[in-house]
Amino acid sequence: DRVNRKWLVVGSLFVWSGVTYLMGYADNFHELYWLRAVMGVSEALYIPSALSLIADWHQGKSRSLAIGVHMTGLYVGQAIGGFGATVAAIFSWHTTFHWFGIVGMIYSVVLIFLLRENPDRMIAEQPSSAAGKEKRPSLFGGLSMLFSTWAFWIILFYFAAPSLPGWATKNWLPTLFSESLDIPMAEAGPISTITIAFSSFVGVILGGILSDRWVQKNIRGRVYTGAIGLGLTVPALMLLGFGSSFVAVIGAGLLFGIGFGIFDANNMPILCQFVSAKHRGTAYGIMNMTGVFAGAAVTQLLGKWTDGGSLGEGFAMLSIIVLIALALQLYFLRPKTDNME
């Protein structure tokens, strides 16, 4: 929110790609551990900057679709990552890390020439008078504004609650597929990853198109679209938890992915209805941090449930939290505009 977002995007991509390259030289766990920590910081710099930049370039009729198209990159990356072990088996894991890192660093250089900051933002960053400079929002002033807005607290919970099953599927779905379908992990990993990635890809595109059209007729269209996505994840989590046949489990995975994709495409557009452009990066950064913390907690919790043989029940119980978030969202989120200034 305070510096040029183009250079945050380019810099973070270069750093995490460089870290990926260096991982190929790691000799022990501690080296991987600290390199992964640096990667986490650089990745955290990226997502608020990128989504804020996209939201500024795409307003009204194309915002949700643009965010959705961007999110497809994450899902494609996850799907490709599902074959990381296969690639490593062919070329060695050292070479795999090296080349993924090299590709990322080259692409960051390409972005220097192709990525542009929004012109309106650049004008705002160059006030014509000393008085204009004084109006630049302070860090703590922005945080104070966000946390004093009740709608932001609702959005924060609305974002964090689905992050629990979202991270649960990323980290534990292969194990659940392996146990429920009685198949080896070597098969369960790619099946679960591709199932979620493909269906989420479909979900973000559908959710983006539906939201952009609905909001033209009803200002709560984005809220309703996000609610549809969350609603789809509830039966999906129940089926994932208690399903035992191939059709039930795979079908549940597809349903969850579509629902989560619809939800994912509308987070930033909904935020734009309640938070001004000056604070959107900060707001999404806080949301992303909260979601990751929730994911870390549920990953550890599901690990304990797995040891106790209750992984399926754990997935099903997560649907309760999603239902609470869904109810709060529909009752409290009543935007007055599609683009808060």
Task: Describe each model-derived feature in a short phrase.
Residues 1-27:
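Conserved MFS/SLC helix-loop-helix module at the cytosolic interface between two early adjacent transmembrane helices
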Residues 4, 25-31, 59, 243-244:
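Helix-breaking motifs and short loop linkers at transmembrane-helix boundaries and internal kinks
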Residues 9, 32, 220-226:
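Primarily marks hydrophobic transmembrane alpha-helices of the MFS/SLC 12-helix fold
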Residues 35-73:
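Cytoplasmic helix-loop-helix junction between adjacent transmembrane helices
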Residues 70, 74-119:
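Helix-loop-helix hairpin linking two adjacent transmembrane segments in secondary transporters
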Residues 118-154, 180:
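Juxtamembrane intracellular "pre-TM" segments in multi-pass secondary transporters
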Residues 144-205, 264, 268, 299:
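Extracytoplasmic gate region of multi-pass secondary transporters
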Residues 272-309:
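A late C-terminal transmembrane helix in Major Facilitator Superfamily
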